[in-house]
Amino acid sequence: MAVSEVLKNVIILNGDFEDIIKYVDKNTFIYMDPPYRPLNASSNFNEYSKEPFNDDAQRRLSKFCNELNEIGAKIMKSNSDPKNTDENDEFFDELYSNYNISRISASRSINSKGTGRGKVSEILITNY
């Protein structure tokens, strides 16, 4: 099937993530790619709107994922893996302890220092 055919039944929304709840049912698949949690002081850009997407916003998103999960929607969420810089950082492991967390290798080609480019671990969180 052509992508254009599949996309005829897709709704793409732009806004606060909580605004989508009225469109969600058990047949909904949601992929979330929020601003990534900074891994260090030099990678701390997370202000895509007037409010920074900080740890409190990450917690709010986690609670929202729980609501979506209760409805029966399929959820996939990506983010940075804090274990890249601190093996003991359990932030996402604790927030999403009832979900499946996979660590995947991702390439980074943008960095002011050539030595900072290369492979890093990212997380994929799913409820299926």
What residues fall within each predicted segment?
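Conserved phosphate-coordination/catalytic loops
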Residues: I11-G15, P52-R59, G116-K119
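Short catalytic/ligand-binding loop motif for oxyanion handling, primarily in non-cytosolic enzymes
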Residues: I21, P38-A41, K83-E87, N111-S112
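SAM-dependent methyltransferase catalytic-core segment centered on the flexible catalytic loop
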Residues: R37-G72
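Anionic group-transfer/hydrolysis microenvironments
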Residues: P35, S80, Y128
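SAM-dependent nucleic-acid methyltransferase catalytic core
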Residues: M1-N46, R60
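Class I S-adenosyl-L-methionine
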Residues: L95-Y128
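Short, glycine/charged-enriched secondary-structure capping and boundary segments
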Residues: N27-T28, N44-E47, E90-F92, R117-G118
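Conserved Class I SAM-dependent methyltransferase catalytic core
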Residues: Q58-S107
